[in-house]
Amino acid sequence: MRGALCRPDVLMRPCLRPCARLPRLPPSRRLPFSITTSCQQLPRTSPGRAGFSSLASLESRQNDRTRCFSALRSLSSSQLLPTTAPVLARHNSTTATSQMPLERKAIEIEKRIAAIPLERYRNFCIVAHIDHGKSTLSDRLLEHTGTITAGDGNKQVLDKLDVERERGITVKAQTCTMIYKHRDGLDYLLHLVDTPGHVDFRAEVTRSYSSCSGALLLVDASQGVQAQTVANFYLAFAQGLSLVPVVNKIDMASADVPRVLEQLETVFELDTSTAVKVSAKTGQGVGEILPAVISNVPAPVGDAKKPLRMLLVDSWYDTFKGVVLLVRLFDGTLKQGDKVYSFATGNEYIVGEVGIQYPDAVPQKVLRAGQVGYVFFNPGMKRIQDAKLGDTFTNVGCEDTVEPLPGFEEPKPMVFVAAFPTNQDDYGRLADSIAHLVLNDRSVTLQKDYSEALGAGWRLGFLGSLHCSVFQDRLRQEHGASIIITEPAVPTKIIWSTGEELIVTNPAEFPDPDDHRIRSATLYEPFVNATVTLPEEYVGRCIEICENARGVQKSLEFFTATQVILKYELPAASLVDDLFGKLKGATKGYATLDYEDAGWRQAQLVKLNLLVNKKAVDAVARIVHVSQVERLGRQWVTKFKEHVDRQMFEVIIQAAAGRRIVARETIKPFRKDVLAKLHASDITRRRKLLEKQKAGRKRLRAVGNVIIDQSAFQKFLSK
């Protein structure tokens, strides 16, 4: 043993096998230091190399060995301690203790859930206008139920996307299961959904209602009832949800709780005697919310003994698990190994794992009727398109006896853009990234597209301009991909003289002015019913903005002494043209906007093209109203001129509405001074050289192509 310890290579590579002959040392006679630890501190170098940086370090380690042997000789063999075994034991116990809390947590949650009957389940969501405090209230509820540990770092716990934390808004409806011990001493299983507040993500809110029996209608105590508050109330009311009014931010100096309660009674005819007054920031009054939920929200209806009937609510992609499904069980149970059948696709799957969001994924042995949880299959879904939201799953063999649940209404895109990779070599990787995002956001429509200027790409449909912007941010943050996106445009409907209809979402497909059929066709554009809430002193300016946007006023109501609700019928194209930004600017940020589809209206529309040396740039074309042609045409040519480099010949940039040129800019060519070498020659020689240069430029312009870098398109299309 002594010889082995004296070898440098053994010191540098300590033996990890415990010595069976050496028994455990009593605490009173253990060494003051660990031989193994000392050996591990030596450099890990091969025996053929210099293992020590200096002679001093070598002498120091030799002294350590000498002290070790002295201590060992002073002990009897029955008292010797194996030096490596405790190290291994500590290492293994550390790994076990890091895993055991998670396993114990899952087992403890499973036991508590198994003891809760369906009558003590409550599924509810939080709905409100944007920035009224939904995510902050969710954090306080998670702390109150012990789902997460209380602390200052709990901010937007359920907002898991980078774009949500960056912008401070909720984009995806997020779910969480909570176990709450009520005042009667009984456990209740609560399922919470934190929904988005912006109108562009209303499809998320609508899907969330399918898994809930009630909702917290949250209102800011200083802002009062606003546009999305009204819209979300009527959505929840139409779904038959039980509503619990909650007034938030009561700790603010500008809070006016009596005014807000009066608004709730006047606008929604709600009984405000049961309203809960809270401050989600400080936690004041949060403890009264869950008892109100238990008292006012009914338990879900279901039977765990019946065959499985499961609704697909949401889906996302995981690198290791594949397609993960968020499901709501109406009947039956679901566990690992079960075989399920999809009504939408007819495919059969084997369940690989089930679990709940607590708030992160916690595996469970079984999901029961009334619960909301996640599931993924093993083997997984072959195609992302197989995960159809609103699909019903049941046990294999029960598809003939189980009636599928009504699915979701497909959201209709309001805004269309063309998207192209900045580098065509990245097309394949970008296609996979977009497919993964579309799996998680089913309100996006996707079609392949091609542009002569920008190459292969896609035609994407969104619910609004913010929806489009968030999608672009998610693509960059989650997948590291950047794309060129054209200006948002709304669809156009063409009814030919024969009565046939054509919906055009790509301006490149709009008929040319040479097509004789377009002269006798009727054109329609989409309209929306917009609801604007604003303070009374800004009414005049907002009416002017809506009138300039070709809006038609429907009503003007005072729902308090100082707050006004304006209802307008507006073209959807005005929303793309930053109508909301204009309203916010005119009201110092107090205006709020909500809208819903109002169908088609006849309009005078024309295709606006950007021409470079009389050749159309298809990626920039738009279908606009005739009243906007002059303004947009002038903006286009002025902006595009800034980003196109000078050429050896003259470049003419024009905006054309049909056959009519509405604006023009010219980029002068580089000019060579052909007269520099003539000095004092006669005028005829000078004129001859100038005419020769002019003829050469004319030939170059006839055969030359304008080279436009893709960065020019990127800068032109950016706001």
Swiss-Prot record:
Chief location bin: mitochondrion
Any one biological process term the GO annotation gives: translation
Keyword DNA repair: no
E.C. code: 3.6.5.-
Top-rank taxon, per record: Eukaryota
GO MF entry, a single one: GTP binding
UniProt domain tr-type G: residue ranges: 119-301
The protein's name in its UniProt record: Translation factor guf1, mitochondrial
Organism field: Neurospora crassa (strain ATCC 24698 / 74-OR23-1A / CBS 708.71 / DSM 1257 / FGSC 987)
